[in-house]
């Protein structure tokens, strides 16, 4: 544009100097303009082209967004399951399921570290303390924590080897039998599905700590929209949100631990506390039943710790990022649960009135502990952290349920439409289905919504223990299948540090936990045998059996209880196809680690 103006000015000054008339000047100006157009282009056309290009870019952007919701053609992925057996179809379909691989190592690390921190820890630990006392809470968290440690390590070994859609849900079908995959998968999806509306209600009730004038249904709607929008951004949206929310939750727990140690040692209105509440009123409440009653609360607190494996199929390089996330399990269990349980037991007696009679955030031992220490602003901070935790768990609920439902659908265990994957790698129908269940959160306006959700949760009350136990069984069958087919453990990319011993002991611990829960459900604490209480706590047990039998009958597979070890597919779904090359690379990596100093080897074992 400046070029054209300069040319015209030069021509006009030249014409004036030589005595040209106005027509000649105009003609010269037009010629100059034409030459300028020829040399530098017509600026008006440039402007118009720029406008058109901008409009086209905007149209293309919205078109790309629109097209991203169209289905991913599985035939383009090379999937033809028409001539395959149910087991073969399950294995191949889950291996080639086109979920987007957009999670990075930092996402996986924070999902592993802080993804399971939620209302189970911040509020549920209070119920455990009231029923069992500080000693029972510590024992219960240690026992369930050990069981989870074996599960996550076993699952890490399997997920690094086979980063397939659905993770452990697909492993149930591959290493056990598709009916087990359908049963455990639906129970697992149901637990997340029911968690979403309950977390929405928890968020609305938590907000009422500050404002009781706004109808809680309004807050349910707000949080529902936020969670749904996050998940419609795909796995990258889920990963980024969990990354930042987990950082906040981790900082909050670490801050509480530091503050709790200070209050215990005498910083606060109460002076030195130490372990006096372990002596008066005592370490245990209700004896062995009190210890057993902690298991369900502990399972609720630990729930979601396995999500890191579910995310493996959507991770760019699970071979590198997943082992590091799995190894951190020991530290997060110890720091965020065991250490927190010890501090809570030191700061809050199980006879505390707020603990026994409070509701919501008021019954949180975190809030009670700092309030008794004379720090008045911290309850508001913890309340905000609980809101963040609720959003995080709601976000994970949609993610966990939708991925599980989509995996079941692609395996042929649910209607095909549930496995709809759009071009953005989102299981769209499964996300919308899970989000629709979240609308049950509007039951917050009903007077007896607590009873409704008690029965909802009874569907999946023990399902976490069944799922975790089945993961350990799958790990054992994976190792047994390697031996039965003459394969070496040298081809295992990441070996569970606890090995098969961990899986065996984990199964034993989980069986004892389930037996204890059935006992406490039949004969509740402080009351005679109660049939209704039993069904509230153990409905998932007969439901699991009926569901498994239904799958066996529908698929007419009663002639096969297990997939034979010799018939288990040990290759489909690997990202490293050349087994011999893989074994060579792994041997070199292990040799490098062996050559390092002892301190480094210890570091690599734990991190």
From Swiss-Prot:
Glycans are attached at residues 357, 395. Gene3D superfamilies: Amino acid/polyamine transporter I. The keyword Plastid does not apply. One of its GO terms (biological process) is S-adenosyl-L-methionine transport. It is a multi-pass membrane protein. Its main location: membrane. Residues 1-45 are annotated as: Disordered. Induction: Expression is under control of the CSY1 amino-acid sensor. Expression is also regulated by HAP43, GCN2, GCN4 and SSN6. Induced during biofilm development. InterPro entries: AA-permease/SLC12A_dom, Amino_acid_permease_CS, Amino_acid_permease_fungi, APC_YAT. Keywords: Amino-acid transport, Cell membrane, Glycoprotein, Membrane, Transmembrane, Transmembrane helix, Transport. One of its GO terms (cellular component) is plasma membrane. The chain crosses the membrane at residues 110-130, 132-152, 184-204, 214-234, 243-263, 291-311, 330-350, 373-393, 427-447, 452-472, 506-526, 531-551. Residues 11-30 have a biased composition (Polar residues). Residues 1-10 have a biased composition (Basic and acidic residues). The keyword RNA-binding does not apply. Pfam families: AA_permease (PF00324). One of its GO terms (molecular function) is amino acid transmembrane transporter activity. It is found in: Cell membrane. Amino-acid permease involved in S-adenosylmethionine (SAM) transport and required for SAM-induced morphogenesis. GAP4 is also able to transport arginine and thialysine, and thus probably also lysine. Belongs to the amino acid-polyamine-organocation (APC) superfamily. YAT (TC 2.A.3.10) family. This is S-adenosylmethionine permease GAP4. The gene is GAP4.
